[in-house]
Amino acid sequence: MKSILIKIENIIRNEMDKIGGQEIRMATLHPSDNWKKTGGWDAVDVLFKVNSRTEKEYALGQSEEEIVTPIAQEYAPSYRDLPLAIYQIGQKYRDELRAKSGIMRGREFGMKDMYSFHESQDDFDRFYEIVKEAYLSIFKNCGLEVKVTEASGGNFSDKISYEFMVLTDAGEDDILYCLSCTHCANVEVSKEKEGELCPKCGKSKLQRGTAAEVGNVFDLGKKYPKSFEYTVKDKDGNDVHPIVGCYGIGTTRLMGTIAEVFGDEKGLVWPKEVSPFQVHLVRLGVNEKIIESADRLYEDLRKKNIEVLYDDRDLRPGEKFADSDLIGIPFRFVVSDKTVEQNKIEVKKRNSSESVLVSQDDVIKILE
């Protein structure tokens, strides 16, 4: 699980760095004073609240607006310091009444959250679109097809936000989407109903589907800078409140969604981009030639920097194959009496029922 999360986080990190995001580490313990300034201490009902031995009140971080705004206030006092985009990848805590579905909705979960600060609405709008495109690249690189969905801003904003939804029965949201264009809206904010013509293209009737939210982007406006009395000097020397954007991706939920979308009745089917290993090497038999052949293949793969899970257990083939299907690594390489006799390797893709025999010289080419 950890190696999958690391790969997902690195995909995210790569795209955030490309668009100018600066990675930092923000506090997990939030002073209550910060939350009281924004009104969130009493208004947000999912806060885990704790008291120190010195009777100071804190909240476990469920989002970072109350922490990141004072950081920007200290380090970006002028329009020359903007735009500023900072992000972190870490753990969040929410006192959910109905935590369920494992890592899809828990009281502790992984999150990438980025915040951007801008002098003008035009500059924010420009960056907002850049982040949306970066998010599409992230989800594509994770093997997912997402729908950019109009949604409510919830506790964060009174403006329309955008959520990145993946169609799956494991989701908790209902969306209406068009098959002929990119229009998609959460049923909570949609002015149209299922079966009505798409308001964007007018070509198809809107379909209803269940989806999982894997990311979101919000226009927070000037709400948080006003709460903290954060202003910057503009080009004319005037004090103005910066405009803030918020961009989140639930890393553990993203992993769970990938598992739900690509899994089958036998187990998991990890896309190669996030799979914990590229190859599941299964050795069948314990005679010297089989062991030597399997060990040599393992070392050859490792020398090519190919991640390999080597199953050298003394179990029946059926048990090993069942475990292999359950784990869901993209390629299974089998070394057995049959393959050793023919100087070949049996290769099977996890998402295929067919296997082929490939010469040992060519087996690595399959992974290229």
Regions found by a protein language model. Give the residues of each.
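NTP/phosphate- and nucleic-acid-binding module
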Residues: 1-368
